[in-house]
Amino acid sequence: MMRDNEGTLWVMTNSGGINYMSKQSKRFSTYSLSLTGMEKADKEIGPFCEDREKNVWVGTRNGLWFFNSQTHSFHEYFLKKSNIKYDIRSLLLEGDNLWVGTYAEGLHVLNLKTGNIKSYTYSRDIPNTLCSNDVLSLFKDRKGEIFVGTSWGLCRYNPQSDNFITVINVGAMASVTDIYEDMYNNLWIATSNRGVFCYNTIG
């Protein structure tokens, strides 16, 4: 659920598509995913966020879509020229960059102004890569640091060296599904079956 800068309330569902209610109408309307050309798998709506141009980006199990605030229509966005439809699991807007986390295909950073894309993947042979290619959660703390939750643990992006530092390694079958920051600079890390971890970003 999200309220955009125009006051529109967006409600994304697992199988019922995209619902929205503007400040003026006070009633919910639904974007029919079948009418936009989306396939059945696209009805499984995942993460979403709003960019500086008031466009709403939506991740699905079968690709990345965005809602054009000028034309009030949805469009599919391919992260690669080969028109590969990634399984999008997490989104984070950071300035002009849209961070896109996928299942099994790593992390992709899209510059919304230039259209350039930088991709990051896990490699056992290269140090300081992602913990895993399953990027399930993305979070920017109040200091501006970006944390990446994966199916093997939590890592932090290092902009100076353009790589990643492992913060918490929870191992297999314990995906980092959500990240929350409290007023004491603690990050609360929710996992799929290992409980909750607390990480202090100061100490």
Where are these regions (language model features)?
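Carboxylate-rich, polar loop motifs that coordinate divalent cations or form catalytic acidic clusters
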Residues: 1-203
